[in-house]
Amino acid sequence: MNTLTQIRFIWKPAVFFACLLPALQAVGDAFGVTGDLGANPVEALQDHFGNWGLRFVLIALAVTPVRQITGRNWVTRFRRMLGLFAFFYVLMHFLVWLLLDQSLNISAIGADIFERPFITIGFAAFLLLSAMAATSTNGMRRRLGRRWQQLHYSVYAVGILAVWHYWWQVKKDVTEPLIYATLLIILLGYRVVHHWRHVHDRKKKAGARIVTA
């Protein structure tokens, strides 16, 4: 069995199931099977889905550095799945807030989005992630052409906005937001350094060609 066959029939189903475990845990906790949601179940669900949404954004952002460092190009075959799971958990986070916390009170929802800054930036991250999820298919990629790549660069903004949203929401203990912020800085910093080295190498090679000519 070659690598591509293993990925398609073994590793992709395994990764899909692993990505689904946090959602299954939330269902189990809601029914008291795997635990409980505590005194404030709505807040517990919001935190659970929001945290996992942010984690999957960071995991998706880690795919490119892992590929470049290890040389294992096959890891990119999981990037779309990881990105869609990031959207799934952020969507669940949003729906819990919309349906259970706000009870679909449109005026209260609008007031929160426009008057509470941490919700404003969280909603902006959700909209960007929604646009990327809606255009994640191969057909949309062909249809949008170069604009597809430009749109999907928004994942960097999503990461920044999501960490900012979480940091602003936490009132006392910022340990977790600080961990996520550090990981995001590492992931984005790696890209900046890698891009700078790539540009530097190209200039160096161009200079060498001019000298030899």
Where are these regions (language model features)?
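Membrane-embedded alpha-helical bundles that constitute the cytochrome b-like, heme-associated redox core
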Residues: 1-213
